[in-house]
């Protein structure tokens, strides 16, 4: 036999509901705290961005001034009146052209960094200030909207509580009325059963006395039955009335329950999401995007300007050419480097001879001297060929040393999480002391040998 179902008492149901509502209320409070924290973090972030770019603007301006001082220091030397024409002539030489472009690049970098500092101070920082003001103002309004949404939700929960209590009350009345009706029905059945038993137990008597007794008993039974019937009808009417109220209250409770669940779902799934991205974050990310893109535009244009200057310097570096510079130098100072006039034969005391005299007795001497010169030239030619090969090999060695492609320092900019790797990379570059000392010693030794050969055998 199955045990009867256990029903929760009203107090248990109310307690569970109160607990659930308290949890929701606590959640709502934490939601506002969370949004407050987000607002504080946002304000702090925007303030940090302002301070960062303000400090960066100062650094850029200081850097610009230092670059300007650097350029002006050397440009002032170039503009000095001493040897002005010589300096002007030197400008056509490729190394001097590189130097001038380098100074111009520094000047342009100085101007660009001044512009960058101005953009930070008068464009980017005001944008962050505006974003901060807008964000604070919108958050304040969003908080008011969120508070109103939470108040509306709590109002719905309170209404559900009231409807639920009404349902419990009417349902309890209905159950009570039903119980009384059943009790009345039992009494009616019991009364009817008594009447039947009494009729069965009656013994035969005289006709007159029997008739009187029966009439009296019937009257009593009818009176009792009528009372019970009236009581039953009264309980039936009360039960019907309470049952109707209970059904209506139950319907109201179910409708309110459905509406409450829909309101809770709407608040948590839609309202909260809309509150954050359509109220609290309204325009925040877009405005921040514009401010940071202004920074990117400034930095990229600075980089583009620098690249243009570096491209000009790179072009000048590629045009570094010793042969062309030698030709330009000789053309500029033609009077210095042009060959002098030939020495002419100066006749003495009217002597007009201007050619060798190959007559006897000097002919044989001239022939012998010519043979000696030819023999000597053959020997020198062989020696010079060997010396030439040695000089060419030595010169090639020097050129290999001075043209080695050791200028790529890209590895120095491959940073990792550990600064030790950076230091290690830098220490292994061309400028490390052991490496450069060895290179310099090798180069100087080769140069010394080369010029020794030149001095011994001439050019």
UniProtKB/Swiss-Prot annotation:
Q: Give the matching InterPro entries.
A: AH/BAR_dom_sf, F_BAR, FCH_dom, SLIT-ROBO_RhoGAP
Q: What positions belong to coiled-coil segments?
A: 363-401
Composition bias type Basic and acidic residues, residue spans: 181-202
Does this UniProt record's set of keywords contain Lipid metabolism?
A: no
Annotated Gene Ontology cellular components are: cytoplasm; glutamatergic synapse
Q: What is the effect of changing residue 250 to R?
A: Does not improve solubility
Q: What biological process terms from GO does the record include?
A: cerebral cortex development; excitatory synapse assembly; extension of a leading process involved in cell motility in cerebral cortex radial glia guided migration; inhibitory synapse assembly; negative regulation of cell migration; negative regulation of dendritic spine development; negative regulation of filopodium assembly; positive regulation of neuron migration
Q: Decide whether keyword Glycoprotein is in the record.
A: no
Q: In which tissues is it expressed?
A: Ubiquitously expressed with higher expression in cerebellum. Probably expressed in fetal and adult neurons (at protein level).
List the Gene3D superfamilies: Arfaptin homology (AH) domain/BAR domain (1.20.1270.60)
Molecular function via GO: protein heterodimerization activity; protein homodimerization activity
Q: Which domain of life is it from?
A: Eukaryota
Keywords attached to this Swiss-Prot or TrEMBL record, sorted alphabetically, are: Coiled coil, Neurogenesis
- A Pfam family found in this protein is FCH
Ranges where the F-BAR domain occurs: 22-325
List the residue ranges of the region (Disordered): 181-211
The role this protein plays is: Human-specific protein that acts as a key modifier of cortical connectivity in the human brain. Acts by inhibiting the functions of ancestral paralog SRGAP2/SRGAP2A, a postsynaptic protein that regulates excitatory and inhibitory synapse maturation and density in cortical pyramidal neurons. SRGAP2C is unstable but is able to heterodimerize with SRGAP2/SRGAP2A, thereby reducing SRGAP2/SRGAP2A levels through proteasome-dependent degradation.
Record text on subunit structure and interactions: Homodimer. Interacts (via F-BAR domain) with SRGAP2/SRGAP2A (via F-BAR domain); formation of the heterodimer inhibits SRGAP2/SRGAP2A function.
What more does the record tell us? Answer: This is one of the 3 duplications of the ancestral gene SRGAP2/SRGAP2A which has undergone human-specific segmental gene duplications. The appearance of SRGAP2C in the human genome is estimated to 2,4 million years and corresponds to the beginning of neocortex expansion in human evolution. The emergence of SRGAP2C at the birth of the Homo lineage probably contributed to the evolution of specific structural and functional features of cortical circuits in the human cortex.
Protein's name according to its UniProt entry: SLIT-ROBO Rho GTPase-activating protein 2C
Native source species:
Homo sapiens
The primary gene name is SRGAP2C
